[in-house]
A protein has these predicted regions:
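Glycoside hydrolase catalytic-domain context in secreted enzymes
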Residues: 1-201
Length: 201
């Protein structure tokens, strides 16, 4: 079935989750529900629905070194292997989409997710994110590149506005995402909660 064959209501239902960690099935179209799990450093799967931050009820899982640490080696093969290992674990847990890797740049020391991002450099970020994505997807599990774009703070992240000129946006903030998408071809891209120059992602 092609997306062009779906009605507006059917397309809308594809964007609606059954809960925080599952997509909604559309049985009449042969589309099954998809289980998702957070996973930039290890598969964080919920035993049951938790709060929006997922701070409770996580199952035990393998935890790999953070992106900031793995980036120190500039080793794309290592990131591929980490991604593949996470993909295998996801398959064993019935997870079809891993929410990771994170590809934002570290532009300030107070960003609450600096550990989750690879680097200040868009080339290194994009290449390593692409390798991770290819590794995950080599096991038949989708990877979701996040948080597009300019997710630079956790404080009031749902209402913040990242203001920057177009050259900085293109050459720095979007370049890593561009490389990750072109070279990694992720199954999905997660938008950020913040606005960029007044427009929400």
């Amino acid at each position: 079935m092609e997306l062009t064959e779906l009605s507006s209501l059917e397309l809308l239902r594809l964007c609606e989750g059954a809960d925080c960690w599952h997509t909604r099935a559309v049985p009449g179209l042969g589309l099954h529900a998809l289980r998702m799990a957070d996973g930039p450093h290890g598969l964080r799967r919920q035993e049951r629905a938790g709060d929006m931050l997922g701070m409770n009820a996580s199952k035990r899982a393998t935890c790999f070194p953070t992106a900031v640490l793995t980036a120190c080696g500039w080793d794309e093969a290592l990131l591929f292997e980490i991604g593949a290992a996470l993909g295998r674990e996801a398959l064993a847990e019935g997870v079809g989409l891993i929410l990771g890797p994170g590809a934002n740049l570290k532009r300030g020391p107070l960003c609450g997710r600096n550990f989750e991002y690879f680097s200040e450099d868009p080339l290194l970020t994009g290449r390593l994110a692409a390798a991770f994505i290819r590794g995950v997807q080599s096991e038949g599990v989708g990877a979701c590149l996040k948080h597009f774009a300019c997710n630079n703070q956790e404080y009031k992240r749902f209402s913040s506005n990242s203001v920057l000129d177009s050259r900085t946006l293109r050459e720095l903030y979007l370049r890593g995402f561009e490389l990750a998408v072109r070279e990694g071809r992720p199954a999905a891209v997660m938008c950020a909660y913040n606005a960029v120059n007044g427009e929400h992602c």
